[in-house]
Protein backbone atom coordinates (compact mmCIF):
# COMPACT_ATOMS: atom_id res chain seq x y z
CA UNK A 1 0.00 0.00 0.00
CA UNK A 2 1.43 3.37 -1.05
CA UNK A 3 0.49 5.45 1.99
CA UNK A 4 2.26 8.55 0.69
CA UNK A 5 0.03 8.54 -2.38
CA UNK A 6 -3.05 7.50 -0.42
CA UNK A 7 -2.99 10.25 2.20
CA UNK A 8 -4.73 13.46 1.19
CA UNK A 9 -3.48 16.85 2.40
CA UNK A 10 -5.19 19.56 0.36
CA UNK A 11 -5.36 23.10 1.68
CA UNK A 12 -6.50 26.36 0.14
CA UNK A 13 -6.07 29.97 1.20
CA UNK A 14 -9.01 29.90 3.62
CA UNK A 15 -8.78 28.35 7.10
CA UNK A 16 -11.61 25.91 6.33
CA UNK A 17 -10.55 25.04 2.76
CA UNK A 18 -9.00 21.65 3.42
CA UNK A 19 -9.38 17.92 2.90
CA UNK A 20 -6.98 15.96 5.08
CA UNK A 21 -6.48 12.27 5.84
CA UNK A 22 -5.87 12.31 9.60
CA UNK A 23 -5.24 8.63 10.08
CA UNK A 24 -5.14 5.24 8.38
CA UNK A 25 -6.78 2.86 10.86
CA UNK A 26 -6.01 -0.33 8.94
CA UNK A 27 -7.47 -2.24 6.02
CA UNK A 28 -10.41 -4.43 5.12
CA UNK A 29 -9.66 -7.58 3.16
CA UNK A 30 -11.52 -9.27 0.30
CA UNK A 31 -13.83 -12.12 1.27
CA UNK A 32 -14.01 -11.11 4.94
CA UNK A 33 -16.86 -9.68 7.00
CA UNK A 34 -16.68 -6.60 9.19
CA UNK A 35 -18.84 -4.91 11.80
CA UNK A 36 -19.18 -1.15 11.31
CA UNK A 37 -18.19 0.92 14.38
CA UNK A 38 -17.17 4.53 14.96
CA UNK A 39 -13.68 3.27 15.75
CA UNK A 40 -13.26 1.35 12.51
CA UNK A 41 -14.24 -1.91 10.86
CA UNK A 42 -14.03 -4.93 13.19
CA UNK A 43 -13.42 -8.39 11.73
CA UNK A 44 -16.25 -10.82 12.56
CA UNK A 45 -17.66 -14.24 11.66
CA UNK A 46 -21.25 -13.02 12.00
CA UNK A 47 -23.65 -13.20 9.07
CA UNK A 48 -23.89 -10.27 6.69
CA UNK A 49 -26.71 -7.91 7.70
CA UNK A 50 -29.94 -8.51 5.82
CA UNK A 51 -30.32 -4.86 4.83
CA UNK A 52 -26.90 -5.01 3.17
CA UNK A 53 -27.38 -8.40 1.52
CA UNK A 54 -30.77 -7.83 -0.09
CA UNK A 55 -31.87 -5.18 -2.55
CA UNK A 56 -34.36 -2.78 -1.04
CA UNK A 57 -37.50 -1.32 -2.54
CA UNK A 58 -36.53 1.51 -4.88
CA UNK A 59 -37.71 5.08 -4.38
CA UNK A 60 -36.72 7.74 -6.91
CA UNK A 61 -34.93 10.61 -5.13
CA UNK A 62 -35.07 14.23 -6.21
CA UNK A 63 -32.52 14.55 -8.99
CA UNK A 64 -31.25 16.63 -11.87
CA UNK A 65 -30.99 15.26 -15.40
CA UNK A 66 -28.89 16.61 -18.24
CA UNK A 67 -27.01 15.50 -21.33
CA UNK A 68 -23.23 15.48 -21.41
CA UNK A 69 -20.19 14.11 -23.19
CA UNK A 70 -17.65 12.22 -21.06
CA UNK A 71 -14.14 12.92 -22.37
CA UNK A 72 -11.51 10.79 -20.67
CA UNK A 73 -7.85 11.58 -20.14
CA UNK A 74 -4.85 9.33 -20.68
CA UNK A 75 -2.97 10.99 -17.82
CA UNK A 76 -2.69 8.56 -14.90
CA UNK A 77 -0.21 10.61 -12.87
CA UNK A 78 -1.55 11.53 -9.43
CA UNK A 79 -2.04 15.23 -8.68
CA UNK A 80 -2.69 17.28 -5.55
CA UNK A 81 -6.37 17.39 -6.53
CA UNK A 82 -6.76 13.71 -7.47
CA UNK A 83 -4.79 10.82 -5.97
CA UNK A 84 -5.96 8.55 -8.81
CA UNK A 85 -4.51 10.61 -11.65
CA UNK A 86 -5.48 13.22 -14.22
CA UNK A 87 -8.99 14.46 -14.89
CA UNK A 88 -10.93 14.55 -18.13
CA UNK A 89 -14.01 16.60 -18.95
CA UNK A 90 -17.76 16.14 -18.69
CA UNK A 91 -18.98 18.67 -21.25
CA UNK A 92 -22.51 19.95 -20.63
CA UNK A 93 -24.51 22.78 -22.19
CA UNK A 94 -24.81 24.65 -18.90
CA UNK A 95 -22.73 27.10 -16.90
CA UNK A 96 -24.42 26.24 -13.59
CA UNK A 97 -25.65 22.98 -12.12
CA UNK A 98 -27.71 22.71 -8.93
CA UNK A 99 -28.00 19.14 -7.65
CA UNK A 100 -31.02 18.46 -5.39
CA UNK A 101 -30.21 17.31 -1.86
CA UNK A 102 -32.08 14.56 -0.04
CA UNK A 103 -31.55 12.62 3.18
CA UNK A 104 -30.08 9.21 2.38
CA UNK A 105 -32.41 6.25 2.88
CA UNK A 106 -32.10 2.62 1.87
CA UNK A 107 -34.83 3.12 -0.71
CA UNK A 108 -33.56 6.24 -2.45
CA UNK A 109 -29.96 5.01 -2.53
CA UNK A 110 -31.20 1.81 -4.20
CA UNK A 111 -32.24 3.95 -7.18
CA UNK A 112 -28.53 4.25 -8.00
CA UNK A 113 -27.36 0.91 -6.63
CA UNK A 114 -25.74 2.33 -3.48
CA UNK A 115 -26.58 1.04 0.00
CA UNK A 116 -27.39 2.61 3.34
CA UNK A 117 -25.56 0.98 6.25
CA UNK A 118 -25.68 1.74 9.94
CA UNK A 119 -23.49 1.30 12.98
CA UNK A 120 -23.40 -2.35 13.97
CA UNK A 121 -24.11 -3.69 10.49
CA UNK A 122 -22.04 -6.59 9.15
CA UNK A 123 -20.79 -6.01 5.60
CA UNK A 124 -18.41 -7.49 3.06
CA UNK A 125 -16.62 -5.37 0.48
CA UNK A 126 -16.75 -6.04 -3.25
CA UNK A 127 -13.00 -6.01 -3.83
CA UNK A 128 -10.07 -8.18 -4.80
CA UNK A 129 -7.59 -5.93 -2.98
CA UNK A 130 -7.15 -4.74 0.60
CA UNK A 131 -8.84 -1.37 1.15
CA UNK A 132 -7.53 1.25 3.61
CA UNK A 133 -9.81 2.49 6.39
CA UNK A 134 -9.19 6.17 7.07
CA UNK A 135 -10.34 9.12 9.12
CA UNK A 136 -10.70 12.07 6.77
CA UNK A 137 -11.70 15.68 7.50
CA UNK A 138 -13.22 18.16 5.05
CA UNK A 139 -13.45 21.88 5.85
CA UNK A 140 -16.60 23.93 5.43
CA UNK A 141 -15.13 26.06 2.62
CA UNK A 142 -13.25 23.30 0.81
CA UNK A 143 -15.59 23.44 -2.19
CA UNK A 144 -15.51 27.22 -2.68
CA UNK A 145 -11.89 27.92 -1.77
CA UNK A 146 -10.15 24.80 -3.07
CA UNK A 147 -12.24 22.52 -5.27
CA UNK A 148 -13.63 25.28 -7.50
CA UNK A 149 -10.28 27.10 -7.82
CA UNK A 150 -8.90 26.03 -11.19
CA UNK A 151 -5.22 26.01 -10.18
CA UNK A 152 -5.99 24.07 -6.97
CA UNK A 153 -8.90 21.60 -7.08
CA UNK A 154 -9.46 22.16 -10.78
CA UNK A 155 -13.26 22.31 -10.58
CA UNK A 156 -16.22 20.20 -9.47
CA UNK A 157 -15.96 16.61 -10.69
CA UNK A 158 -17.67 13.24 -10.92
CA UNK A 159 -15.87 9.91 -11.17
CA UNK A 160 -16.04 6.13 -11.13
CA UNK A 161 -13.50 3.40 -10.37
CA UNK A 162 -13.29 -0.32 -9.71
CA UNK A 163 -13.11 -0.04 -5.91
CA UNK A 164 -15.97 0.44 -3.43
CA UNK A 165 -16.29 3.27 -0.91
CA UNK A 166 -17.70 3.65 2.57
CA UNK A 167 -18.46 7.11 4.01
CA UNK A 168 -19.59 7.24 7.65
CA UNK A 169 -19.93 10.41 9.80
CA UNK A 170 -17.93 10.15 13.03
CA UNK A 171 -20.01 12.71 14.96
CA UNK A 172 -23.23 14.70 14.78
CA UNK A 173 -21.56 17.90 13.54
CA UNK A 174 -20.92 16.59 10.02
CA UNK A 175 -22.85 18.11 7.14
CA UNK A 176 -22.72 18.45 3.38
CA UNK A 177 -23.65 15.68 1.01
CA UNK A 178 -22.34 12.99 -1.30
CA UNK A 179 -23.14 13.17 -5.00
CA UNK A 180 -24.22 9.89 -6.59
CA UNK A 181 -25.47 9.31 -10.10
CA UNK A 182 -25.76 7.18 -13.20
CA UNK A 183 -25.77 7.67 -16.95
CA UNK A 184 -27.24 6.09 -20.06
CA UNK A 185 -26.67 7.21 -23.65
CA UNK A 186 -25.05 10.47 -22.49
CA UNK A 187 -28.01 11.29 -20.22
CA UNK A 188 -26.91 11.88 -16.63
CA UNK A 189 -28.97 11.71 -13.45
CA UNK A 190 -27.49 13.02 -10.19
CA UNK A 191 -28.65 13.42 -6.58
CA UNK A 192 -26.88 14.73 -3.47
CA UNK A 193 -27.30 12.62 -0.32
CA UNK A 194 -27.01 13.87 3.26
CA UNK A 195 -25.71 11.11 5.52
CA UNK A 196 -27.43 10.98 8.94
CA UNK A 197 -25.23 10.34 11.96
CA UNK A 198 -25.24 6.64 12.81
CA UNK A 199 -25.45 5.69 9.15
CA UNK A 200 -23.12 5.48 6.18
CA UNK A 201 -23.21 5.13 2.42
CA UNK A 202 -21.65 2.10 0.74
CA UNK A 203 -20.80 2.91 -2.87
CA UNK A 204 -20.18 -0.20 -5.01
CA UNK A 205 -17.49 -0.30 -7.69
CA UNK A 206 -18.01 1.73 -10.88
CA UNK A 207 -20.85 3.90 -9.58
CA UNK A 208 -20.70 7.62 -10.43
CA UNK A 209 -19.96 9.65 -7.31
CA UNK A 210 -18.16 12.61 -5.73
CA UNK A 211 -17.47 13.12 -2.02
CA UNK A 212 -15.93 16.62 -2.11
CA UNK A 213 -19.18 18.26 -0.93
CA UNK A 214 -19.14 16.45 2.43
CA UNK A 215 -18.17 18.56 5.45
CA UNK A 216 -16.67 17.36 8.71
CA UNK A 217 -14.95 14.24 9.99
CA UNK A 218 -15.75 10.92 8.34
CA UNK A 219 -14.60 7.33 8.42
CA UNK A 220 -13.82 6.76 4.75
CA UNK A 221 -12.74 3.65 2.92
CA UNK A 222 -11.01 4.56 -0.31
CA UNK A 223 -8.10 3.28 -2.34
CA UNK A 224 -5.72 3.98 -5.20
CA UNK A 225 -6.43 2.18 -8.47
CA UNK A 226 -5.38 2.47 -12.08
CA UNK A 227 -8.90 1.63 -13.27
CA UNK A 228 -10.76 4.92 -12.92
CA UNK A 229 -12.12 7.91 -14.77
CA UNK A 230 -12.53 11.36 -13.23
CA UNK A 231 -14.05 14.24 -15.18
CA UNK A 232 -14.53 17.92 -14.38
CA UNK A 233 -17.79 19.65 -15.31
CA UNK A 234 -17.14 22.12 -18.13
CA UNK A 235 -19.21 24.08 -20.63
CA UNK A 236 -18.65 23.72 -24.42
CA UNK A 237 -16.22 26.67 -24.31
CA UNK A 238 -14.23 24.79 -21.63
CA UNK A 239 -15.21 27.06 -18.73
CA UNK A 240 -15.78 25.47 -15.34
CA UNK A 241 -19.42 24.74 -14.55
CA UNK A 242 -20.50 26.16 -11.18
CA UNK A 243 -21.82 23.06 -9.37
CA UNK A 244 -23.83 23.57 -6.19
CA UNK A 245 -26.09 21.57 -3.89
CA UNK A 246 -29.67 22.76 -3.44
CA UNK A 247 -32.80 21.86 -1.52
CA UNK A 248 -35.04 19.32 -3.22
State what each model feature region is:
Residues 1-197, 210-248:
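Active-site region of the double-stranded beta-helix
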Amino acid sequence: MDLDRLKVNRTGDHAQSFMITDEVLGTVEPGKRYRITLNGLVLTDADISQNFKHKRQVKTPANIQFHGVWITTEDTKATDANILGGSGTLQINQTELCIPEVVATAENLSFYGAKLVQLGDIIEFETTEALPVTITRVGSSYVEHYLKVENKGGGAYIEYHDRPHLHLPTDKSTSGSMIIGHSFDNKYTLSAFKIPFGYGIYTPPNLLHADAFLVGKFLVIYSVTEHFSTVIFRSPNHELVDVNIGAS
